[in-house]
Each structure stands twice: as structure tokens, then as C-alpha cells.
């Protein structure tokens, strides 16, 4: 398994950590103090840049504790970090609560999960193969 190269963009940045040996996600830490008011979205820097292997991408997910205790979660629900991106990983956090929330430098703000992907070529066609489901969507298969 290859090593993931991580560049600290400031000496005070915190390297990602995993909560347990089997944890799928790496905790990402805030590199700054940020106040997020109710209904507001703020970009929070991690102070880190990554070099992840080709054929994989980084998915940035909410941390369950931050979402349930402070109402903070990534604004775009899941962030996608491509393997050729070399800039700082920044998490856009949205405050879903009725109270202001302070993110402190060193707080865990999200989790990064590395996943493989398939880059299949796409072609335009006039017709698609029929299936039993057809065009049924949005609950069409039941509750």
C-alpha cells in the first residue's frame, strides 16, 4: 500500500489522525479559529495539502459528533478531492444550529476517506437498454 504524502503548509498544522486501527476516515483538523453564525457557511483551512495516488480520490465527510453536538457539517455534504489537486484542503462548514459555533485551531472538523474510482469513457447514444425498473425513481421501488 502506498504512503500518502502530506505537506504541512504551516508549522502549526495538525497531521490527520485515525480514531482507531479500523477507522476508515482520517480526522482533519482546523488550522484557524473561525466563528460560524447560525445559517452561515465558512471555509475552514486545514493547513495541509495531499498527494494521493492516481485512481483514488479523497472524500470529505462530516464528523458525526460535530454535526450532532454543534450542528456543523460540510456545506456540500461530501467534498471530492481529486488526485491531481495539490492545494490546501479546505472544508466549507455550514452551521445548521440556532447558536453561533466557534471552531478553534486544532479542532477536528471533518474526516477524509480515500476511495478508488472508475473513469469509464462516456458515449452519446440515441437509446438505452430497457430494464424492469425503467424510469422509476424517487421512491418508486417502495419505502
Give short role names for the model-derived ranges.
Residues 1-143:
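DUTPase catalytic domain/fold
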